[in-house]
A protein has these predicted regions:
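Outer-membrane pore/translocation modules
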Residues: 1-51, 104-112, 159
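Outer membrane beta-barrel transmembrane domains
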Residues: 54-160
Length: 160
């Protein structure tokens, strides 16, 4: 990932994270039968330092997964989700980051983690067009915002 966009260390939200991330990726899809599909995409993120803040986010292992069954030629139902685990500490000025929460100091390097699982529906129509909706409930969340993920995609091919 390349740090594009505007960055200001004084702002809470920015369009850039102001550091490079090297992220090797591995993915595969297995079709054990004509109607079933199992897919996995795994990455490992090596984050570089943000030189404006002397902050370096920890390394992150992450994977997305899905399993689906083709009910009809136009309808697939399944499960989907993701897992994320930060494997090294966040550091600032070379020191492990410590935060205070609920009146106690948390000395875990702000290592984030989350697991999510939920249903998925994929519908094909008009020969090659498709619509997909996925929802996932997050569990076992640490050191990151917690919530549910809702993802919708509409694909309509066209010719030039």
């Amino acid at each position: 990932t390349v740090p594009t966009g505007k960055y200001d260390a004084e702002r809470l939200a920015n369009t850039s994270n102001n550091f490079y991330t090297y992220k090797p990726l591995f993915s595969f899809t297995w079709l054990p039968t004509e109607r079933t599909e199992l897919s996995l995409k795994a990455t490992y993120s090596f984050n570089m330092e943000n030189h404006d803040t002397d902050y370096r986010s920890g390394q992150i292992f992450h994977f997305d997964y899905s399993a689906s069954y083709r009910v009809t030629d136009n309808l697939r139902l399944g499960l989907n989700g993701y897992y994320l685990k930060q494997t090294t500490d966040d550091k600032q000025n070379g020191e492990t980051v410590r935060v205070f929460g609920f009146g106690e100091e948390v000395d875990d390097g702000v290592r984030g983690q989350v697991f999510a699982i939920g249903p998925a529906v994929h519908l094909t129509f008009l020969k090659y067009a498709s619509a997909e909706i996925r929802w996932a409930k997050e569990f076992d969340v640490e050191n990151r915002p917690e919530g549910d993920m809702l993802w919708a995609k509409l694909t309509i091919p066209f010719e030039l």
